[in-house]
């Protein structure tokens, strides 16, 4: 069982956090030149079999009608600056803990190791 990386992004129209961040940067901080902001959630998942991963992916990690997923790598994002924010070692990661609890409920097995981060992409 290897570590799987899953990126989840809200589809256009459902990307409220990205829209809010874009508005804040333009209006509150008066940052000029930003054309688009994308917020992408990253999950590193360890301890699941292929079947368990396939079973829990659309139930726990994303909503198929609302989200777009990328497995293992993000596609090329032209003219973008990307930075990721994640919990430091020892800090509680509520998103990862909630996902691990949900996976445990679905699979009825031991809780997997999950880490999460948020990637912010800014197009200039």
Task: Show which residues each predicted segment covers.
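Non-catalytic terminal accessory/regulatory regions of metabolic enzymes
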Residues: 1-124
């Amino acid at each position: 069982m290897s570590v799987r990386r899953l990126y989840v992004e809200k589809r256009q129209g459902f990307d409220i956090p990205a829209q809010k961040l874009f508005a804040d940067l333009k209006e509150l901080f008066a940052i000029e030149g930003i054309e688009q902001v994308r917020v992408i959630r990253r999950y590193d998942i360890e301890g699941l079999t292929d079947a368990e991963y396939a079973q829990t992916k659309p139930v726990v990690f994303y909503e198929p009608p609302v989200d777009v997923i990328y497995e293992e790598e993000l596609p090329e994002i032209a003219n973008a600056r990307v930075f990721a924010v994640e919990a430091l070692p020892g800090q509680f990661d509520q998103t990862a803990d909630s996902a691990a609890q949900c996976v445990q409920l679905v699979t009825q097995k031991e809780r997997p190791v999950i880490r999460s981060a948020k990637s912010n992409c800014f197009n200039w």
